[in-house]
Amino acid sequence: MLSVTNALAVLPALVAAFAADRPTPEDPEALLQQIRGRTTAHLAQLPNYTCHEVIDRLLRRRGAWNRLDTVEVEVAFVGQQELFARPGEERFEERRIDRVVPHGTIGNGAFGAHIGAVFSQDVAGFKYAGTGKKDGHRTVRYDFSVPLEKSRFLVRHAANEVIVPYEGSVWVDANTLDLVRVDLHVKHIPSHIGVRGIEESMHYKVMRIGGAEFLLPRKSELGATDDTGAYSLNLVELRNCREFKADSIVKYGTSSEGSATRESPQQ
């Protein structure tokens, strides 16, 4: 089983206009600092909330796609941690996602941890990569990389696990500086883990929670290639997001930045 883990980030939508002297792509470092500050400030404003998460899992071998299954879990975002429960359970606990979904490729962090980790001070290195269009928005792009010594990205396959470096790209709306999309790639995985590479994309959209609008990673894709060349793809979507109620029972433990777990695919 392949499991991927990283950090939590969901962003409130823009509610005020920017000043006329907002940094522009001609000053990419100043613009990056404004994006970073905006992202981290919004994280602090995010209420605790819970969503129904639907995961369609597919497998490709020798060019042919096979739909494996659809997995549904309840996920709560509380204090910038992801807590999981099976549908129908009344109790959220801080437990690894592969304890809730014990078979196949699974991950957490897409709806929180990754962006929080990337925009933490002194974790990722950024490089301005120009302007363009992405997912219907006029965007500014930055590429980033997180070295091994600063990474908390955990890859777990069968009985093996390892922390790995990763890299990727961030696209923000050129007018609002709201996140549009985040892609990340894991390429340098030790051979004994049994996974050649991992890639993930997160797509952001404004959603209403508790009477206010927030920018959430409404859907994501998680792909992984194992040492046999089999490619697993998870299509993940958040539904029915709502404010987390205090009468839910929550157990806290040690937080993690994000992870991926992958078991050898079953057909």
Q: What spans do the regions from the language model cover?
A:
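Hydrophobic h-region of N-terminal signal peptides that target proteins for export
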Residues: V10-D21
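Bacterial N-terminal signal peptides that target proteins for export
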Residues: M1-A9
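Structured extracytoplasmic
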Residues: A20-E167, A174-R181, H185-S201, K205-Q267
